[in-house]
């Protein structure tokens, strides 16, 4: 679940084949352009296909343009996701393991990437529709792990993200106490590998 959220939370795109979708995409782009950086607390609720609550949690969320992301689940079990602009690090303290992938791998895999990625080629992989202050983003590739991401705003403030996976599970994240990052908090996007942890390096290696 955490890896799915990690991939999902580093991505968000646009489709211009139909005017309604193009309008929704442009509206979302405008709202995201107003968020240069953000830090907030979040509360998480995960429900299954029958709307039964299967997990709750809380933590701290931050993002900065371009391609920087911080996701620290503090309860019930700690986990950390950091996108530093180049790589995405997924750290599980309990298992003493960290996975790392290219940020482009995460961006191409899920709709939440648009939060921190303004690239027409990436946006073209998704459909965007909107209702009032909420935008639903779904991948054109139906084999993606995340079937839909919904992001909601109160005017220019990002207030909620909802992730729906192919198994019918829904993860809802309510944001609170939103602030802009100060200089010292930019270090949130720098992941330092702890001692004595296993590293699962999934980054695509360029051929020599």
From Swiss-Prot:
Coiled-coil regions, chain positions: none
Q: Which UniProt keywords apply?
A: Chaperone, Periplasm, Protein transport, Signal, Transport
CDD domains, sorted: LolA (cd16325)
Q: Tell me one GO biological process term.
A: lipoprotein localization to outer membrane
Subcellular location(s) per record: Periplasm
Pfam families named among the record's database cross-references = LolA (PF03548)
Signal peptide span per the entry? 1-22
Gene Ontology annotations for the cellular component aspect, listed alphabetically: outer membrane-bounded periplasmic space
The record, for SUPFAM superfamilies, names:
Prokaryotic lipoproteins and lipoprotein localization factors
Q: Does the keyword Transport apply?
A: yes
- Which regions span the lipid bilayer? none
Q: Does the keyword Protease apply?
A: no
Q: Which HAMAP family match?
A: LolA (MF_00240)
Question: What PANTHER family does the record tag this protein with?
Answer: OUTER-MEMBRANE LIPOPROTEIN CARRIER PROTEIN
The record's comment on protein family reads: Belongs to the LolA family.
How does the record describe its quaternary structure?
Monomer.
Question: What does this chain do?
Answer: Participates in the translocation of lipoproteins from the inner membrane to the outer membrane. Only forms a complex with a lipoprotein if the residue after the N-terminal Cys is not an aspartate (The Asp acts as a targeting signal to indicate that the lipoprotein should stay in the inner membrane).
UniProt name for this protein? Outer-membrane lipoprotein carrier protein
Name the source organism.
Shewanella piezotolerans (strain WP3 / JCM 13877)
């Amino acid at each position: 679940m955490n890896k799915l959220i990690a991939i999902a939370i580093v991505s968000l795109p646009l489709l211009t084949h139909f005017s309604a979708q193009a309008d929704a995409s442009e509206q979302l782009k405008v709202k995201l352009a107003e968020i240069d950086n953000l830090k907030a607390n979040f509360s998480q609720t995960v429900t299954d296909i029958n709307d039964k609550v299967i997990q709750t949690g809380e933590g701290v969320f931050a993002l900065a343009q371009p391609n920087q992301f911080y996701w620290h689940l503090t309860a019930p079990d700690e986990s950390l996701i950091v996108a530093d602009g180049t790589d995405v690090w997924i750290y599980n303290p309990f298992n003493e393991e960290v996975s790392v992938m290219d940020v482009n791998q995460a961006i191409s895999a899920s709709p939440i990437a648009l939060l921190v990625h303004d690239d027409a080629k990436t946006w073209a992989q998704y459909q965007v529709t909107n209702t009032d202050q909420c935008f639903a983003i779904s991948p054109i590739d139906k084999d993606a792990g995340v079937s839909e991401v919904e992001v909601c705003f109160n005017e220019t403030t990002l207030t909620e993200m909802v992730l729906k996976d192919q198994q019918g599970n829904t993860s809802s994240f309510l944001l609170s106490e939103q602030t802009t990052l100060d200089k010292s908090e930019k270090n949130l996007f720098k992941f330092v590998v702890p001692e004595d942890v296993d590293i699962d390096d999934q980054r695509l290696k360029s051929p020599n």
